[in-house]
Amino acid sequence: MSRFRLLLLSLIVLCGTFLFSESTFAKTIVNPNQTYSTTTLLNDIKKLEKTYPGLVKKEVIGKSEYGRNIYAVSLGKGDSTVFINGSHHAREWITTNLTMNMIDKYAAAYHSNSNLNGYNVKKLLNNTTIWFVPMVNPDGVTLQQFGLKYFPAKDHAKIIKMNAGSKNFKRWKANAKGVDLNRQYSPNWNLLGGPKNPSYKNYNGPKVASASETKAVLSFVDKIDPEMAISYHSSGQIIFWKYQQTGSRYTQDAKYAGKLSTITGYSLVKSKSFGGGFSDWFSNVEKKPAFTIEVSPAVGETHVPLKNYAKIWSQNASIGLYTAQEGFKLFDTRNTVASEKVAKQIKTYNKTAAKLKNYYSTDIKSQSNLKVTSAHKSLYDKTSKEIKKQEKIIAKLPAKYRSKPNAALKTTKSYRDNALTYMTAIQAGDALSTTNKKLMEYLTAGKLNNTTFAAYDKLVKQTTTTESKIKKMYSKNVQRLATAKYITPAKTNKKNTDYDIARYKLLLDMEEQLENEQYDKVKKNITKYKKMKSTNLHKKLESRFKTMIKAIEDELLLLEAEVPVEPEQPAPPNKEPEVPEPTPEPDPEVPEDGTAA
């Protein structure tokens, strides 16, 4: 008996645990077992966004013909995207219940890190973002659910006319302006039959994508660039998938359609599409897999009863996850191929870019080779342009797929950068040589003035800058040659110029000291000047110095001759200092009475 009780207790605990985990997982926001209105839609979207921040986000992608918001909801964090829409047709709003329930259940599974029907939801949604537009046709849905109540009175008669005079709108498929939104897309649009004027169903509009709702969907799909699309409809438990694909695309889409059929139990439609539908457009224009899934047995011209929903959910619960899984595979394959293609293109160009090395290293054998040729500059410009082009291409790749092309482009950039470093150093060196030459000309001409001093200062700065640039050059041999050609002559001339400028400034100081009659200082500076040996580099300058020093010496002699010489005073003889004789103190006064005071 005790063993039986123990076993029973274990079963109770196990069942309780199972029920708890299921209850936790099953905590829902969306109630799909109700007439799902635009108000319910918005309230649930807001709750989902608040409950799952960073995972669920809403976006208004446009307005309906009567100004209602058309909402898109993203679920996931991946770069890969897939697209699922519902309620193109007003009476098929059960597909809004379905898509909103997907968002709710998938988000809960992600949050609890739970699998759903064998799918790792967190992994899938980290790789792929599923974009839903749960209700493409909010005007039509509102009209079908509530009649004319929420539409302007001035339009009632027109809407009733589109419904063949009936005020019962349960059969309504179109938007509230009488345009069938799933007959608005471009493939074979002009071949579609049906009404020639606005109607509750099948009127394809005055032109392709004339309806606001269709424009919003087209613009949004262009923006998110999904890998795969599911368009949900409600009648027939069938899957449309053949949209004139051929070759590998046909084989690929047939595989996907087969899996969708296996998951849902729905039949694949073998007949050709009539055209004008969203999936026709996505497959034909975007050249990507698209499937129209009809979720319920045919119920006639009305909405699907809510009693059918439980089965619809059981058949479709995994569809969004399967779509996300396969969408990511397509995304990954496409971007891997694109990444490798770009990397290959860059590597091919690198054979051309490598020729830059001849200009900045290989062909530099002597100082005479230190120059920037037009061919060098042309190849550098071409390589820079190629790098910018490839950078733009790489930037379009998701971050995960940029490493290979970036690695190849790094080599291209090294050739470009080394070429630029070389050109920059040569340009700086040539400018330094020009300044050095100019300074030499001034000194040789015997010019020492503000212009000469400015050239000297410029030489000092350019020498430092050029030396820094040379140290960055690719080859040590090229650095050595550039130093010998540019830096050594500049530093030598600077050294000699330093000496000449110092002599010149000393001469100017002596002239000023003469004017101020500071003769002792002049004499000392003359001695100092004569100890400064001539470099004999600039004859005119040296001649000028000799003239100046002679003039100073002559002036000093003349001035010294005019100064009167004072006779020297003999020093006084050494003797003891005179000591003054003491002065006798007066006798104290004696009073008349003969007593001392």
What positions do the PLM features span?
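Soluble metallo-hydrolase cores and metallopeptidase-like ectodomains found primarily
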Residues: Y36-S80
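Long, low-complexity, intrinsically disordered segments
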Residues: P572-A597
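Active-site/substrate-binding loop(s) of hydrolase catalytic cores
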Residues: D79, I94, N101-I103, A107-F240, ...
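Metallocarboxypeptidase
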Residues: K167-K170, Y185-R334
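Extracytoplasmic/secreted proteins, especially bacterial periplasmic and envelope-associated proteins
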Residues: Y36, T40-K47, I94-K105, W131, ...
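Sec-dependent N-terminal signal peptides of Gram-positive bacterial secreted proteins and lipoproteins
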Residues: M1-A26
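Loop/turn elements at helix/coil->beta-strand transitions in domains of secreted/extracellular proteins
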Residues: P53-K57, R68-I70, G78-T81, N126-W131, ...
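Amphipathic alpha-helical assembly segments used for oligomerization, scaffolding, or translocation
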Residues: T333-A571, A596-A597
